[in-house]
A protein has these predicted regions:
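Glycosyltransferase catalytic domains, chiefly GT-A lineage
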Residues: 1-167
Length: 167
């Protein structure tokens, strides 16, 4: 559930966190493949690859990492061992108040792109993702909470994941 004060009459915002509940909305499927409307499927083999990747409860997903992406994290060294960390995961983790140890663990982990992913119906990934999403929504904004939650599932909860290539 999205806290009411975060929605404030804008029910469409709930769609920003709906992916973690696909089996609830569409219960009659064994495997789920999410593809954002702005993603490009160039070859049907990609769809088959995602379905294969999620076998045995694994999460099939791609990291936001590679030649087409700019550097996603930066460190500004102040002096000695003191530094300011700037990364998407770290920023959202601090804002969501998930704890400094978790935020540090996520700081330089390759960001996961939730625009395309696959999971089986009974994968433990759904429960992990939903639990983390509930935590991130308490203090974080709706935008970014779902992505942070899946990054937590992979890098903190150690959800079994099959990372797929960018192309």
């Amino acid at each position: 559930d999205v806290p009411a004060f975060k929605v404030k009459g804008r029910e469409w915002l709930k769609s920003q966190v709906s992916r973690a509940f696909l089996p609830k909305y569409f219960p009659n499927y064994e495997k789920y493949l999410w593809i954002d409307c702005d993603a490009w499927v160039n070859n049907w083999d990609t769809v088959e690859l995602y379905f294969k990747a999620c076998e045995e409860g694994k999460l099939g997903i791609t990291q936001t990492l590679g030649p087409g992406y700019k550097i996603m994290s930066k460190v500004n060294w102040l002096f000695g061992k003191l530094a300011i960390i700037k990364s998407q995961n770290f920023k959202h983790a601090i804002k969501s108040k998930i704890g400094i140890n978790k935020a540090r663990k996520l700081a330089f982990a390759p960001h996961i792109n939730i625009g395309v992913f696959s999971l089986e119906k009974n994968s433990p990934g759904w429960v992990s993702w939903q639990k983390n999403l509930e935590q991130t929504l308490k203090n974080g904004s709706i935008f970014g909470s779902e992505g942070l939650a899946i990054n937590m599932s992979v890098y903190i909860d150690e959800l079994d994941t099959e990372f797929l290539p960018l192309n």
